[in-house]
Amino acid sequence: MDPPGYNCFVDKDKMDASIQDLGPKELNCTELQELKQLARQGYWAQSHTLRGKVYQRLIRDIPCRTVTPDASVYSDIVGKIVGKHSSSSLPLPEFVDNTQVPTYCLNTRGEGAVRKILLCIANQFPDISFCPALPAVVALLLHYSIDEAECFEKACRILSCNDPTKKLIDQSFLAFESSCMTFGDLVNKYCQAAHKLMVAVSEDVLQVYSDWQRWLFGELPLNYFARVFDVFLVEGYKVLYRVALAILKFFHKVRAGQPLESDNVKQDIRMFVKDIAKTVSPEKLLEKAFAIRLFSRKEIQLLQMANEKALRQKGITVKQKSVSLSKRQFVHLAVHAENFHSEIVSVKEMRDIWSWIPERFALCQPLLLFSSLQHGYSLSRFYFQCEGHEPTLLLIKTTQKEVCGAYLSTDWSERTKFGGKLGFFGTGECFVFRLQPEVQRYEWVVIKHPELTKATSLKSSEAAGSSSLISHCSSDPADRLSPFLAARHFNLPSKTESMFMAGGNDCLIIGGGGGQALYVDGDLNRGRTGHCDTFNNQPLCSENFLIAAVEAWGFQDPDTE
């Protein structure tokens, strides 16, 4: 069998010798579900020629805006833009943010061609302001293109996708930064052991998670990245989150209990990804990625929107040139020891709690709203101090020195919308926890068991109405601070899986169904805890307890301090 016919940009000696043009020569399937399965299984991965054909077809079928540059545009402009300069000395566009062009298996001519294509893309897409993933995409596509012009056209179609349901590549700092925050949120929910390690070894976990796209678009070897890209072209952006989460899981598995190779975990992960072949095959990496039962694309999009909104509100929409690359994550702020004092938790314990909260609120500083030692043991005073703040953090210390609490996504003023009756409200971002005698967090049961529900459209769920006790705000959900995991987006088997928080004159309740995660009386004197369906938790402390102290904390924008 003849070796595959590589183009003039590829160093055939670097290409995987196992990839011969064996097996199928054409792809005849047209059904999306079948195409997904074939992509995940690597149907065209062992044929260089077939992969090139599949890329051509999949990219041709991307819905694009009306005016999308094609190969003829490249032929017209490349001479004017490049001039007589040597392609190897051409500068990279500013929007790649000093990202190095991965060479993969390109020869010197191929490396220069990538630079030419990137400059021509910059000429045709002046609206792209931040796109560090693009060099890797262009470099990969060049392996499977007839010439530079065809590669240019493919990249332009990916950038010009106008299907609102199929996000492909971040093209602004706001989109990139919010994606990093979203990835951090997903790690917090789906890779808790790895997240705990990151918190322990890094001063700034968001800085570590902000490197996630580089793991895929730059550090992964070509045969791994191409397999990811195969599925990405069929399924979209969510695949990238899946694979990055799988990488982090494998990193934790290999490194757990071992000393890190350096004091820079960010660099350690990069090296791990670069040498990932020592740990796991491309097939096993994808198998792990698709074994993670993520929420729907719609729910992830809601979270992304919430993170973008938080960044916009703080005026963070472009990268600040005055910030050095090593300090790029100026948006992430830790709990400052000098400004923090609690009667219940230490600075370290508060930082641990902060590592659990959604990334868009980790940008804030803790603000003491209520302290039973300052404001008295009164539930009505507790509500008064907390109203107008969303989210809040509830901390309880018992007379036995046990410490537990809850992160509560919704303003306590929502309790007044039930006509004096006790009604549940909140979203699936709520969670309960204990800190003493040992640390344990319990999230919404649907996060660990998504099979309990299927995401449904907001329109259909509103049309059908709801029989649950969850409050429905009249304001536009897009304007709410916590749209992510709102119960109205899910078909729940019973209302007990969504009893997040409730408050009346005589008591405060967190979690419901089969029991209550936390119940506190109106005098903030006595409480009880037990298993509940909403969080599937164990008792957070002694089942019946006396309260020594209660605190409620809000989230303050550092710019308003």
Swiss-Prot record:
Membrane topology listed for this record: Peripheral membrane protein
Modified residues (Phosphoserine): 475, 482
Residues bound to a 1,2-diacyl-sn-glycero-3-phospho-(1D-myo-inositol): 36, 40, 238, 242, 293-297
Single GO biological process annotation from the record: axon development
UniProt subcellular location: Cell membrane; Cytoplasm; Cytoplasmic vesicle membrane; Presynapse
GO cellular component, one term: neuromuscular junction
Ranges where the TLDc domain occurs: 343-556
GO terms for MF: GTPase activator activity
Domain Rab-GAP TBC: 45-236
Keywords: Cell membrane, Cell projection, Cytoplasm, Cytoplasmic vesicle, GTPase activation, Membrane, Phosphoprotein, Synapse
Record-linked PROSITE patterns: TLDC (PS51886)
InterPro entries assigned to the protein according to its UniProt record, in alphabetical order: Rab-GAP-TBC_dom, Rab-GAP_TBC_sf, TLDc_dom
Tissues in which the UniProt entry reports expression: Expressed in brain, particularly at the level of the cortex and the hippocampus. Expressed in the inner ear in spiral ganglion cells, a collection of neurons critical for hearing and balance.
Main location (coarse class): membrane
Function of the protein: May act as a GTPase-activating protein for Rab family protein(s). Involved in neuronal projections development, probably through a negative modulation of ARF6 function. Involved in the regulation of synaptic vesicle trafficking.
Subunit organization: Interacts with ARF6.
Domain notes: The Rab-GAP TBC domain is essential for phosphatidylinositol binding.
Protein name: TBC1 domain family member 24
